[in-house]
């Protein structure tokens, strides 16, 4: 007998469509607040898993189109998928959380949700030095009856609000969601959806907005037009920012790359990674969480007499279904998906996972949105040092307090928005 399918969307994005089974959320006799009081969450473990997932996802995105810019928020995608797992059970929840690189024998499911709860609370603390807001929302069909437990867990762990939505009026639903996203990302992402499937029943959405000022800003008067080597055969003219400063620096001879860390007034940072010419793919293949840890511990203050960095604005729009499947998160897209912890009157499965991100880097600082370390080196004064990011490079926007990668990307052509 054929089962009618409905659609459920995770927009970070994640887009989901109909199926069922019993969903495990949290033990019935324990509230999220009681569990949060009783258990200490290992923030390092959460950060380590998020970093592992970020690099695994990046390698798949880079492999898909090696010569294109890449920008995404691994944190947004991790939060959205963890949020989804609240309503999953058995093999479905295991597949999601293991796909996010969690070891469930070492970190129980409830501790993972507590970890994300703490992360969200930390990110959303008011600050004069940093604009960082991270949040979740559910756009639920007027006919869909969400289970009380899922509603409560979603609010307690992921601070998710619920917005009743008439998906039968697709145009109005698209307008509602796009305006919500535009507002939450301060206009950086104006449109997440052009249209919606008629079977859409539920949208789980995660957004991130980040804006920070450099501790040592670039002088706009020193920005000039310069060549950027996209490839051996292609060059483009870009606005090249320049700066004289002392900042954390590391030259990795083993992997053939140069690293420069620029800090924000909030003490969060951007790490720029410049592979030697022709070494980008070799470096990408060797990226591991251990590599990032080694780099951060190796950074030393160094006087850079001339740092050259292009001013750029890049964006992305990814359909992540195939890539997540390659990372082991497959069941959520099939009729075997178990999401009866969300509702008991619809069968749900994920139909799409959508992620959109925008990142601007300029003289004053960095602005981005997504929806899914030191000892003075005495040798620094022995010779002048120039570092020119005039060829493809990697970047990581990093929150030091939570040890989280907020954005990860690759700039192959600063002229391509």
UniProtKB/Swiss-Prot annotation:
GO terms for molecular function: serine-type endopeptidase inhibitor activity. Its main location: cytoplasm. Coiled coil: none annotated. The keyword Signal applies. InterPro entries: Serpin_CS, Serpin_dom, Serpin_fam, Serpin_sf, Serpin_sf_1, Serpin_sf_2. It is found in: Cytoplasmic vesicle, Secretory vesicle, Chromaffin granule; Secreted. Residues 1-25 form the signal peptide. GO terms for cellular component: chromaffin granule; cytoplasmic vesicle; extracellular space. Homodimer. Belongs to the serpin family. Serine protease inhibitor. This is Serpin A3-7.
């Amino acid at each position: 007998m054929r089962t009618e399918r409905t659609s459920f969307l995770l927009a970070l994005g994640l887009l989901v469509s109909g199926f069922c089974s019993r969903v495990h959320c949290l033990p019935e006799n324990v509230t999220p607040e009681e569990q949060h009081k009783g258990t200490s969450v290992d923030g390092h473990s959460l950060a380590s898993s998020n970093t592992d997932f970020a690099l695994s996802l990046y390698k798949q995105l880079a492999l898909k189109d090696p010569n294109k810019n890449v920008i995404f928020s691994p944190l947004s995608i991790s939060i959205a998928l963890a949020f989804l797992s609240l309503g999953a059970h058995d093999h479905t929840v295991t597949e999601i959380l293991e796909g996010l690189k969690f070891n469930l024998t070492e970190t129980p499911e409830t501790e993972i949700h507590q970890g994300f709860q703490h992360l969200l609370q930390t990110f959303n603390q008011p600050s004069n030095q940093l604009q960082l807001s991270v949040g979740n929302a559910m756009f639920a069909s007027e006919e869909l009856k969400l289970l009380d437990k899922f509603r409560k867990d979603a609010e307690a762990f992921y601070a998710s609000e619920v917005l009743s939505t008439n998906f039968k009026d697709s145009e109005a639903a698209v307008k509602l969601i796009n305006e919500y996203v535009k507002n939450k990302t301060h206009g950086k992402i104006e449109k997440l959806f052009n249209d919606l499937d008629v079977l859409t029943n539920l949208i789980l959405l995660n957004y991130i907005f980040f804006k920070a000022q450099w501790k040592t800003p670039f002088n706009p008067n020193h920005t000039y037009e310069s060549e950027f080597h996209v490839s051996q055969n292609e060059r483009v003219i870009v606005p090249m920012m320049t700066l004289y400063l002392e900042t954390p620096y590391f030259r990795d001879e083993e992997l053939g790359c140069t690293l420069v860390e620029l800090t924000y007034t909030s003490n969060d940072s951007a790490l720029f990674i410049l592979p030697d010419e022709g070494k980008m793919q070799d470096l990408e293949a060797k990226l591991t969480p251990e590599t990032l840890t080694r780099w951060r511990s190796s950074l030393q203050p160094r006087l850079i007499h001339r740092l050259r960095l292009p001013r750029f604005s890049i964006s992305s729009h990814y359909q992540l279904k195939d890539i997540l499947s390659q990372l082991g998160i497959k069941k959520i897209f099939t009729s075997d998906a178990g999401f009866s912890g969300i509702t008991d009157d619809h069968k749900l499965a994920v139909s799409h996972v959508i992620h959109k991100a925008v990142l601007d880097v300029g003289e004053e600082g960095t602005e981005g949105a997504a929806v899914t370390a030191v000892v003075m080196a005495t040798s620094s004064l022995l010779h002048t040092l120039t570092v020119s990011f005039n060829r493809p490079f990697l970047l990581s926007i990093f929150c030091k307090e939570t040890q989280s990668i907020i954005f990860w990307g690759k700039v192959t052509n600063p002229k391509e928005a």
